[in-house]
Amino acid sequence: AGKKYGSAYPMGARMMSGNSVHHQQLERDLSAFVSKEDSILLNYGYQGVLSVIDALVDRKDVIVYDSECHACIIDGLRLHIGKRFVYPHNNIENLKDQLERATKIVKETGGGILVITEGVFGMSGNMGALSSIVELKKDYNFRLFVDDAHGFGTMGKTGAGCGEEQGVQDEIDLFFSTFAKSMASIGAFVSGNADIIDNLRYKIRSQIFAKSLPMPLVVGNIKRLSLIKNSPEFKNKLWEIV
């Protein structure tokens, strides 16, 4: 791909001259792998998460997040001009308290609640309490955003991440991962329902106002994802070493 397209092609943002069938193929492959309707490619994980959070919420919305979320999430939260509440790491009882507070606010503002956590927390290595958080959807109305940068490719039967590992993949509204961990590459993606992802395509500033992911990385990531899907021995070897 590098010889064919060079290191910079395509030039321009995805919405302009930066789209290609390869970008679209990678998005379809990622969506199928993590069991979501649609996906959007991001140039970098840090920049991508920050921009996704900014695009998802406005001043009427409330964000509730785990205290050990990655710095990229924290910086995304700093852009939020509405309310945000933190709960102690994996403390579900305190999360309930924060959801109660958030629910009262959005009843007045007409907004929504976004809960943000991680699949595998990078500093501690433990998993987010995804199954317990999903249970709370029975009593509270919120969307769940999971940064599974460390779980993608390493957790779950197929490597689809911690949602698959805990049996709640379908209940994750927005699934994010970078390509920098299990795929040893550059770039990232976020997956979810088609209407949410389509909305992001027109609102996510880090992609609208930047050139798209270069073709050698896109084609390479298609191959690397194929290796994750079709060569489980790599994941199995990782766990043997661990």
Feature roles, as predicted:
Residues 85, 89-146:
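Active-site phosphate-binding strand-loop segment of PLP-dependent enzymes
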Residues 222, 239-242:
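Conserved glycine-rich beta-strand-loop-beta hairpin in the small C-terminal domain of fold type I
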Residues 174-176, 183-232:
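Conserved core segment of the aminotransferase class I/II
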Residues 3-44:
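Conserved N-terminal alpha-helix of the aminotransferase class I/II PLP-enzyme fold
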Residues 140-142, 161-179, 198, 202:
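Conserved active-site segment immediately N-terminal to the catalytic lysine
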Residues 52-71:
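Conserved PLP-anchoring active-site segment centered on the Schiff-base-forming lysine
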Residues 59, 79-81, 140, 171:
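Short, structured coil segments at secondary-structure junctions
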